[in-house]
Amino acid sequence: MDLRDRFTEMREMDLQVQNAMDQLEQRASEFFMNAKKNKPEWREEQMASIKKDYYKALEDADEKVQLANQIYDLVDRHLRKLDQELAKFKMELEADNAGITEILERRSLELDTPSQPVNNHHAHSHTPVEKRKYNPTSHHTTTDHIPEKKFKSEALLSTLTSDASKENTLGCRNNNSTASSNNAYNVNSSQPLGSYNIGSLSSGTGAGAITMAAAQAVQATAQMREGRRTSSLKASYEAFKNNDFQLGKEFSMARETVGYSSSSALMTTLTQNASSSAADSRSGRKSKNNNKSSSQQSSSSSSSSSLSSCSSSSTVVQEISQQTTVVPESDSNSQVDWTYDPNEPRYCICNQVSYGEMVGCDNQDCPIEWFHYGCVGLTEAPKGKWYCPQCTAAMKRRGSRHK
């Protein structure tokens, strides 16, 4: 709202200066046409009046330039604030899962670039048309990609939500290469910790909440117009901020139930295998019973080793997740300590915040008013009145004009 009002004021001042300049040019041309016919007193009076109006237009133009500088500072301050919030949100996402911001930005760029048709070269090769000339067929072709982009974004959202539900239900899965084909269970190998993907996040760090936040970010990105969509991560940041308690609860529950769910699933499988093998051994001969008991012991030993490896891997995942969540927070705290508030007012010709010793300009209409000693070449407090270099140059210029 403030920016729009300042732009409106700047536009009004610009129109006022332009109208004044047009009128002064017309008066000057009439003055030179009628100068020889009139008396010297009339010529002096008209000349002084025209010069006075020119100086007034010049002051209005200077005020317009100062207003433009204020608008530039305001926009720059807001941009720095947005960049800091975006960097902070990226650090929070990286703390939960490393590499997710790069994946989201890459997918956003893929959505920004529409896919080119295959037969584009063959369709337009026989009609030599200039690049800047309007072509209705090509315009129609570009508009046809909007539903395709929408379909891609919807498919991406459905994939993210389905992956989140799968990751919440599945436990820790390891590959048991020594198990035979007669065993009742097969454990699939889990993906290594070094490879990160939205669909295959580590369940020990609350994959469901992270994937849902990523889905919300992609949805907010898809709803925006084509252009710069990096700042659309603000939508998922608001989702984290509004649902902080629920997300924290989900993270803690996910960490606590990983080891228990995997171990309970393996124990129930072991008991079922033991009972089935015992029933088969009763109906067979004694030699077969001995063979089955030995095979059962080997399978139980392999399953117990897989259970211990599953529990150890879950503890390793929790330790890694705790380390990744602690270290970036300390880095962010150290970064915040060295940065200043973007809303803090700026002073001096260097456009920086207040620090050290500063001197004030005695001109009441000075737009800056306060200056650092080093920027204006002072080492101690000046005696008497002191004016900044800009005000001094403006006063000298006005004095020379009045002479």
UniProtKB/Swiss-Prot annotation:
Sample GO molecular function, one term: methylated histone binding
Any one GO CC term of the record: Swr1 complex
GO BP terms in the entry: chromatin remodeling
SMART domains linked to this entry: ING, PHD
Entry's localization field: Nucleus
Site (Histone H3K4me3 binding): Y347, M358, D362, W370
Species this protein is from: Pongo abelii
Name listed for the protein in its UniProt record: Inhibitor of growth protein 3
Written domain comment of the UniProt record: The PHD-type zinc finger mediates the binding to H3K4me3.
Chain residue ranges for the region called Disordered: 112-149, 271-310
Zinc finger (PHD-type): 345-394
InterPro entries given in the database record: ING3_PHD, ING_fam, ING_N_histone-binding, Zinc_finger_PHD-type_CS, Znf_FYVE_PHD, Znf_PHD, Znf_PHD-finger, Znf_RING/FYVE/PHD
